[in-house]
Amino acid sequence: MSLEVSHLSFAYSKRGRLVLDDISFSVKKGDLLAVLGPNGVGKSTMFRCILGFLRDYEGSIRLNGLEIKSLDHREIAKHVAYIPQSTYPVFNYTVLDVVLMGLTNQLNLLAAPNQDHIDEAYAAMESLGIAHLRNAGYGEISGGERQLTLIARALVQKAKILIMDEPTANLDYGNQFRVMCRISDLARDGYIIILSTHNPDHAFLYANRTLMIYGGKVIADGTPENVLDAKLIKVVYGVDVNVEDYRYGSRRHKLCVPINGGVGKHR
């Protein structure tokens, strides 16, 4: 399984500004790619191009060597799943119902899931630690549990490339940690993960690749340890930080520590 984006450019109108300008990168089995950049730089637009929702782009997006434009949405859904930010539902479906919605690309119109499908849904929920919530209302569980439910839905879809738009947005610290650990586990299991985040520490802690987008262009691409430094973060986010090494036993990570700009303890 592979995804290659080459010289991708996109504007929402023929005379409009380029939202994406000559974006190129590739991912392979087991990659966890963290896409960083300030609001409005085109991260979500890039995801919509990869998912086949926007097709009037220049350049190429190749899924296993096939141009995305040549594939219909059902075919794309066999390989690529989208996990949005956790949202509150209009109707309070059960967690199991939401997970089973991942079967849409596999069932004919008006067909119902069978017991094998339900068993697959249970297995996906079990792998993410939420099987005990199967009969709970989706609107009644925590934000972190809702996010894990959406990931389980993607697993039932049987896609091996998971596109995640800020998967920890609006989650508290504990739920951010739990969700990111599960996502990291999926990459180790061979899934390709592409996620957007506004937190450089998520890239340091969980990703093996990072892509920094600024002004519609890729300005950094590589391992987080090699490309994320204080100078780059200052340029992109306007925040002065120290990028420091953190060691705990045999584990070693880098972390961002803000050093000015009004940061301090309230007394």
Residue locations for each model-derived region?
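Conserved ABC ATPase "signature" region
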Residues: L100, Q115-L133, K158
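The feature captures the beta-strand-to-loop junction immediately N-terminal to the Walker
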Residues: L36-P38
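Conserved ABC transporter NBD signature motif
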Residues: G59-E67, I76
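ABC ATPase nucleotide-binding domains
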Residues: V236-R267
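Helix-to-loop junction immediately C-terminal to a conserved catalytic motif
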Residues: L51
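Conserved ABC ATPase signature
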Residues: G137-I141, E145
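Catalytic Walker B motif of ABC-type/P-loop ATPase nucleotide-binding domains
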Residues: L162-E166
